[in-house]
Structure formats: C-alpha cells, structure tokens
C-alpha cells in the first residue's frame, strides 16, 4: 500500500459539483492524486484499466447505484481489496448495514465535514 498521501483515489458521483467538493476536500487533507467518474459504469471502466488505492462513491446515482457499484467492485478479484468509502444523504440504518455486509469500509453522511471525512479515511487505513 502506498503512503496515504500518495494514494490514487477515484471519486464517483453523478453531480460534477459534488465531485469537485469531494476532490477539494481530499486535497485539503493532502490527497492530490485523484480521478473522477460520473457514474458506476465509467467508474468500473477506470477501475479495470488503472490501479486505484481507494474509492469514494455516492450512494444515489442513476444507471448504477453506489450499492450496485460496490457489489461490482467486490465481485472482481483484482478490485475486491480496494477500500470503499460511501458518501450519502441517506443515513437509513438498514441501507448502511446492507452496504457494510456487501463490503463497504466506511460511510459519511452529507454534508461532508472535513474532520469527519479525515477520521473515516484514517480508520480505514489504520
């Protein structure tokens, strides 16, 4: 695993403004090696064609939800070990439990607060 600040991170969200906020938040934390995808399908293409150390994805996306993307990531042998942090407006406990059972490493409820986001990332890699 590369040093934390050198990690290549894929940010997946259907809203460009949200991707920008997440990428800027990661940059504030010293994570500058980011790429982005606007849906689950393009995220899978990127994940299969490049090496990523970490994925931040949105729960609610058209075409392929964050949950479906998580399941796809966990189903591919060379991707299943990549840590995934899900960002969601939906804090429903049953959804969170289902995502954790599917292999989610951590989640953050929107709006994303920098210190909480940092703590979640640190916990994944401790």
For every predicted segment, state its role.
Residues 112-121:
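C-terminal output helix
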Residues 6-17, 22-26, 55:
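Conserved acidic segment of CheY-like receiver
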Residues 68, 91-106:
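Alpha4 helix (beta4-alpha4-beta5 surface) of REC/receiver domains from two-component response regulators
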Residues 5, 51-53, 78-83:
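His-Asp phosphorelay/catalytic-motif detector in bacterial-type signaling
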């Amino acid at each position: 695993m590369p040093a934390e600040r050198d990690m290549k991170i894929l940010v997946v969200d259907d809203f460009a403004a949200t991707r920008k906020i997440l990428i800027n938040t990661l940059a504030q934390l010293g994570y500058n090696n980011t790429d982005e995808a606007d849906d689950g399908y393009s995220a899978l293409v990127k994940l299969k064609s490049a090496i990523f150390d970490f994925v931040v994805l949105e729960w609610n996306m058209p075409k392929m939800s964050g949950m479906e993307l998580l399941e796809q990531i966990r189903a591919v042998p060379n991707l299943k070990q990549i840590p995934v942090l899900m960002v969601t407006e939906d804090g429903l406990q049953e959804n969170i439990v289902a995502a954790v059972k599917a292999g989610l490493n951590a989640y953050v409820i929107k709006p994303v607060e920098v210190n909480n986001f940092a703590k979640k990332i640190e916990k994944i890699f401790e």
